[in-house]
Amino acid sequence: MNTVRATFLLVFVLAVSLGQADKDENRMEMQEKTEQGKSYLDFAENLLLQKLEELEAKLLEEDSEESRNSRQKRCIGEGVPCDENDPRCCSGLVCLKPTLHGIWYKSYYCYKK
C-alpha cells in the first residue's frame, strides 16, 4: 500500500513540476505571439492607412476637376411657365404654347415631349 502511495505521490510531483514548466513556456510563447501580433497589427494598420489616403486623394482630385460651369443649371418642371427664346425646361420637357388651359396667359409652358 505504501508503494502505491509513494508511486502516486511521485507521479503527482512530476506532473505538477512539469506542468509548471509548461505553464512558464506557455506564458513565454503567449508573450512572443502577442508581440508578433502587435507588429502584424501595426503593419496592417499602416497598410489600411495608406489605402485610405490613396482613396481620399482620388476623391479630392475628382472634386477639384469639376468646375462650377460643369454643373447642370436649374431646370423648369412640367406645367411651369418658360421663356420661348431661352427655354430651361428639364430633360424630357419642351417649351410649348398651351393648347387648352392657360391660353389667356399668352405664355409658354414646359410640357412632356
From Swiss-Prot:
The presence of a 'disulfide through disulfide knot' structurally defines this protein as a knottin. Residues 60-82 are annotated as: Disordered. It is found in: Secreted. This is U11-theraphotoxin-Hhn1a. GO terms for molecular function: sodium channel inhibitor activity; toxin activity. Pfam families: Toxin_22. The keyword Signal applies. It comes from Cyriopagopus hainanus. Expressed by the venom gland. Residues 22-74 form a propeptide. Keywords: Disulfide bond, Ion channel impairing toxin, Knottin, Secreted, Signal, Toxin. Its main location: secreted.
